[in-house]
A protein has these predicted regions:
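Conserved ABC ATPase "signature" region
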Residues: 74-77, 129-149, 258-259
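Short catalytic/signature loops enriched in Gly
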Residues: 4, 21, 148-149, 239-328
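ABC ATPase NBD coupling module
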Residues: 67, 77-95, 121, 128, ...
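A short, proline-enriched helix->beta-strand linker immediately N-terminal to the Walker B motif
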Residues: 173-177
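P-loop NTP-binding/switch modules centered on Walker-like glycine-rich loops
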Residues: 43, 180, 184, 188-270
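ABC-type ATPase nucleotide-binding domains, specifically the catalytic core motifs of the NBD
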Residues: 16-19, 57-63, 80-81, 86, ...
Length: 328
């Protein structure tokens, strides 16, 4: 595999709530290479979207702050860039597709106006005619029929799938090296979801861009991703090649997520597997492993000692004191 395009090392983020700095991300590390798709998975509140916002430099101010670690993108530490330089990176070399295509677009601007705005900001040498031509070509590239007509309409005239295609067009307008996708298929039905995933795979094959794909849907992970980082309560608990992760999960949380997937060959009226308990609140994080209060393998050591990441193979690491108990 080629050298990483993006390397996140020991990332720490805090949010200030009622005067207290609560750690939302704690030592998150991963890397993404050109042409690779890395999945960030975990249940709601585990820090996936915060990780993306930290990379983009879009943490809510003044409450959200990066307090540790580095974010290296193509040889530059994004955390050290002045705001004007980060502005040139964001939307140009790194783009992001946000959640909820139904609400992410501006309802009082036409599709074309919003897409042309991307070119106005990041391609200042383009004139109005060139911006319009580029926008229409981009709409056609992402599979929107009659792009000239759709250019002039408002988002409410489009279906959810078409709005998501517009979001993808806006994100890819400047041909970014890295595309961050924050649950881009959550609000779509399974047929449209499959179309969007196929579109993204095709565009990636064409451009060679890297993709950081955030989701809680392990089916999407299996379809799209090359490697996976499993997050829980602000920490990366397991990272592996997608086939290795599905075949040989080593962290109890990963094992629980996979076990909760409904099976087509299950028995009638069979109860679904669940992970007992719930994610601890930010102000109640345990001193040791954050999954300890829900883990069937937890010991006293887990409640007091943070597990270090152990490399089980070149592309498989796990942060668990008892991972050997999950070895088949």
């Amino acid at each position: 595999m080629s050298s990483p395009m993006l390397t996140v090392r020991d990332l720490e983020v805090t949010f200030t709530v009622d005067g207290d700095a609560l750690k939302v991300l704690d030592g998150v590390s991963f890397s993404v290479a050109p042409g690779q798709t890395l999945g960030l998975v975990g249940e709601s509140g585990c820090g996936k979207s915060v990780t993306a916002l930290a990379i983009m430099g879009l943490l809510p101010r003044p409450h959200g702050r990066v307090v540790g670690g580095t974010i290296d993108f193509e040889g530059e530490d994004l955390l050290a860039l002045p705001p004007e330089q980060m502005h040139r990176v964001r939307g140009n070399r790194i783009s992001m597709i946000f959640q909820e295509p139904m609400t992410a677009l501006n309802p009082v601007q036409t599709v074309g106006e919003q897409l042309m705005e991307v070119y106005r900001l990041h391609r200042p040498d383009y004139g109005k005619i060139q911006r319009k031509a580029a926008a229409i070509a981009m709409l056609q590239k992402v599979g929107i029929p009659e792009p000239e007509r759709r250019f002039a309409i408002y988002p409410h005239n489009l279906s959810g799938g078409m709005r998501q295609r517009v979001m993808i067009a806006m994100a890819l307008a400047c041909e970014p090296d890295l595309l961050i996708c924050d649950e881009p298929t959550t609000a779509l039905d399974v047929t449209i979801q499959a179309q969007i995933l196929d579109l993204m795979k095709g565009l990636q094959a064409e451009t060679g861009m890297a993709i950081l794909f955030i989701t809680h849907d392990l089916g999407v992970v299996a379809e799209l991703c090359d490697e996976v980082v499993v997050m829980y309560a602000g920490r990366a608990v397991e990272q592996a090649d997608v086939f290795e992760l599905f075949d040989h999960p080593r962290h109890p949380y990963t094992h629980g997520l996979l076990g909760a997937i409904p099976r087509l060959n299950g028995q009638p009226k069979q109860l679904l597997n669940t992970i007992r308990g719930q994610v601890p609140a930010l102000h109640e994080m345990p001193a040791g492993c954050r999954f300890a209060n829900r883990c069937p393998h937890a010991s006293e050591r887990c409640s007091r000692e943070v597990p270090a990441v152990e490399q089980l193979a070149p592309h498989h690491g796990v942060a668990c004191h008892h991972w050997k108990e999950l070895t088949p």
